[in-house]
């Protein structure tokens, strides 16, 4: 009996070592050229949503004022609480990954980010699609309204107006969504990631420069603690299979689009500086 147990343990160890060695062999070490291309591409991809998102934030705020809507702006208190809420969320996700199976969690996240990514991408594509589709094509309006209760006790749950061009945008976004859902390809991940980052820079608005300083200062401490003082951030980033980061393979010159040795940049490192830059642009426009 003891010999059988020893043989089983030995076989398991050998299989694990062989699998690890196979993975290390399959992963080609990054060359200086590959690293330069990967990190340079990440820099370019980080600049794109900040640049376009900042200009879109100017237009978004202008539209809100013209429509008489009250803009949702981050206050000093919100900025001070942001790192605390982010820390609680990050640690909560870390605990969830320690308790439950990573496969089931990522399955739920994949479905959630599929719908979220399709909507984000459709919003980004809307101005382009509206210019490409000729005005001669029919563009019927639709109004989606959900209310709860009746008569004077009605509570509006959803009030969304859209048209045929919006449906085209949703269709295009759904194509990329299915690609991400089925393949989890890094290009599909980046497309969704760029859409999330651009929407974040557009819609998250600071009210003053001091608010931005409070936010950036708090998140500076947040990053130092969770990245360098603990392994929580790294563990969550490696376990969290969702388009919350931009990636680019360092071995793309050797393996092409099937490369798997990725350099990565979190969307938070793009959106947070981006909303501060968008604030400065709105100040200049005024």
Task: Tell me the role of every PLM-derived stretch.
Residues 1-286:
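A membrane-topology feature that recognizes alpha-helical transmembrane segments
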């Amino acid at each position: 009996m003891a010999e059988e147990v020893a043989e089983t343990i030995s076989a398991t160890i050998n299989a694990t070592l062989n699998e690890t060695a196979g993975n290390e062999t399959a992963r080609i070490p990054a060359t200086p050229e590959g690293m330069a291309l990967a990190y340079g591409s990440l820099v370019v991809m980080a600049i794109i949503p900040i640049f376009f998102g900042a200009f879109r934030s100017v237009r978004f705020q202008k539209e809100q004022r013209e429509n008489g809507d009250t803009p949702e702006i981050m206050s000093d208190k919100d900025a001070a609480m942001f790192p605390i809420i982010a820390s609680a969320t990050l640690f909560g996700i870390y605990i969830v990954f320690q308790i439950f199976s990573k496969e089931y969690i990522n399955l739920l996240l994949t479905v959630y980010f599929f719908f979220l990514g399709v909507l984000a991408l459709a919003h980004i594509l809307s101005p382009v699609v509206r210019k490409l589709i000729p005005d001669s094509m029919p563009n019927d309006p639709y109004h989606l309204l959900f209310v709860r209760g009746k008569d004077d006790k009605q509570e509006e749950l959803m009030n969304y107006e859209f048209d045929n061009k919006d449906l085209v945008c949703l269709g295009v976004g759904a194509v990329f969504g299915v690609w991400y859902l089925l393949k989890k390809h890094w290009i599909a991940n980046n497309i969704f990631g760029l859409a999330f980052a651009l929407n974040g820079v557009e819609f998250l608005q600071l009210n003053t420069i001091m608010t931005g300083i409070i936010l950036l200062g708090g998140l500076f401490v947040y990053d130092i603690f969770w990245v360098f003082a603990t392994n929580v951030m790294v563990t969550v980033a490696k376990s969290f299979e969702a388009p919350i980061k931009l990636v680019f393979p360092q071995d793309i010159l050797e393996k092409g689009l099937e490369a798997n040795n990725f350099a990565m940049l979190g969307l938070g490192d793009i959106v947070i500086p981006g909303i501060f830059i968008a604030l400065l642009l709105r100040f200049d426009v005024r």
